[in-house]
Swiss-Prot record:
Topology of the protein relative to the lipid bilayer: Multi-pass membrane protein
Protein name: Fluoride-specific ion channel FluC
Binding site for Na(+): G76, T79
The organism's place on the tree of life at top rank: Bacteria
GO biological process: cellular detoxification of fluoride
HAMAP family: FluC
InterPro entries: FluC
Transmembrane stretches, start-end: 6-26, 36-56, 68-88, 99-119
Activity regulation statement: Na(+) is not transported, but it plays an essential structural role and its presence is essential for fluoride channel function.
Annotated catalysed reactions: fluoride(in) = fluoride(out)
Keywords on record: Cell inner membrane, Cell membrane, Ion channel, Ion transport, Membrane, Metal-binding, Sodium, Transmembrane, Transmembrane helix, Transport
Length: 128
């Protein structure tokens, strides 16, 4: 039950952060069809989870409870694959196949690159 509460706490914080960041990105972005708020949240989430994975790779650096709070709760509540899927479907239904394809490819490629970068940054920092 304790870990469920940790997930709920992390999820609440992550969801509130997602809502806030998405609103800021929407307010300051150009009016175009690319779903920039969700894209921004998801790539930042990839960077953060990469950094957390780098920290977790050090034995005992992140406790199992903290891992549940951060990975499952915080980052899980922050990123949003379901919104990514829905926005892609809307783009496809509106006939915006090129934008949908760019969104899919850039989300995956940029997300993976930032995950790797986050992991490597933490690894380099911890070696110094």
């Amino acid at each position: 039950m304790y870990q469920v509460m940790l997930v709920a706490l992390g999820g609440a914080i992550g969801s509130a952060a997602r809502f806030t960041l998405s609103g800021l990105v929407l307010r300051y972005s150009l009016d175009w069809r690319f779903p920039l708020p969700t894209f921004t949240v998801n790539i930042i989430g990839c960077l953060v989870i990469g950094m957390l994975a780098g920290l977790a790779s050090k034995e005992g650096f992140i406790s199992p409870d903290m891992r549940v709070l951060l990975f499952t709760g915080l980052v899980g509540g922050f990123t949003t694959f379901s919104a990514f899927g829905l926005e892609t479907l809307v783009l496809l239904r509106e006939g915006l196949v090129g934008i949908a394809a760019a969104y899919i490819v850039s989300s995956i490629v940029v997300g993976l690159v930032l995950m790797w970068l986050g992991f490597e940054l933490v690894k380099m920092t911890m070696q110094a």
